[in-house]
Amino acid sequence: MHSILRFEDKLDFEITDVYDTKYSLRVGKNTNKEVKSDSSGHIIKNIEKIDWDSFDTLILGHIDMLILQMKSYDFKNNLISEALRHNKQIYSFDDLGQIVKNNKRVQSPTILPEHLPPFRYEKLHENIVPVVGVFGTGGRQGKFTLQVTLRNCLRNKGFKVGQIGTEPSALLFGMEYVFPIGYNSVYSLRIHDYDVIRYLNETIHKLEDTRCDIILVGSQSASVNIYPNHLYYYNIFQTNFLMGTRPDAIILSISMNDTYEYIEKTISFLESTVECEVIALCLFPVVQTFDWAGPVDPSNITVSYTHLRA
C-alpha cells in the first residue's frame, strides 16, 4: 500500500482519502511522513467515519494482522458489505472469493487453474523481446519501488514497456499482469510447480504480442535459501518465477548486511538457473540509521563498493 502513496503522482486515478483504524495509531498523521515521500499529503482518517460519497472505488490492503489487533473478526466482512451497499467498486490485495462470489465490482489479484494456457505437450515459447528482472537477496529492499522507477524512466525515454508485477498494487500502476507471490500468496496463487512456469511463459508471450520494446519483471524477497532447516525460507515461488520469466538481464537488490559471499552465491544461482547476466547491484537502504549500540550518525557512515568479479 505504501507504494501507491509514494508514487501517487504516477497513478491514473485520484486518491481522495486514506483511512485506517484507530488501533494502528496512525489516524491523524500525514501520509508523506508515513511513506517518506513528498508526493503524498493526506491526513489519515478513521475508517469508522468513512465518507462513502467521496469516492467510487475502495482499495483494500492486507488487513489480516490489523483484524487480529482489533479482535473484530467481522470487520472485513462488514466493510465489504457496507461498500457494496453503497455501490462501490472494491480492489482487494487479498482474495475475497470466500466472502464475495461472482461480483464484478469486486476484484483481487488471484491466479487460478482455469487461467492456465492450453496444454501443449510441455512445449514453451521462446522469449523474443528483452526481459529485465529485479531480484533480491532478502526482503524490504525496495524492489517494487525500483520496478516502478525503471518503468517510469523507460516510458519517459519513449520505450513501450510490458510488465509483470508481483505486488497486488501492480495493476493499479498500469502494469499488464500481476503474479502475487508476496504476502498471503497461499490464498492468491492457486497454481504450483510446472504450472507456474507454463503460466508465466504464456504471459511473457502475450506481452510480446503487444509489440512492447522491453519487458520488466520483479520477484519477491530472497532468491536462494540460507536457512535449510526451515521450510519458510525455501524460495520455491521465486525460483519458479525466475524459470518462468527467464530474464536476459537481472538487477540484484542487496542489503548493507549482506556478505560478499552471499551476494556471489545469489549471482551464481541466478545466472546458472537461467541464461542471464546480473548487470547491476542496487543497495537499499544506503544509510542504516540504527545498529546494536543505538542510533548512528549518518555523517560517520561510509559506503564502499568492491567489484565482486575483480
Task: Set out the residue ranges of the language-model regions.
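Conserved C-terminal guanine-recognition region of P-loop GTPase G domains, centered on the G4
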Residues: 262-273
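Walker A (P-loop) phosphate-binding motif
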Residues: 119-157
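Flexible, glycine/proline-enriched loop segments at strand-loop-helix junctions
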Residues: 68-70, 134-141, 187-191
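ATP-dependent carboxylate-amine ligase catalytic core
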Residues: 26-54, 153-238, 244, 258-264, ...
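G-domain G4 guanine-recognition motif of GTPases
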Residues: 137, 253-256, 281-294
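Conserved small/polar residues in nucleotide/adenosyl-binding loops
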Residues: 306-310
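Extreme N-terminal, non-catalytic leader segments
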Residues: 76-131
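Long, basic/Gly/Ser/Thr-rich N-terminal segments
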Residues: 1-98, 300
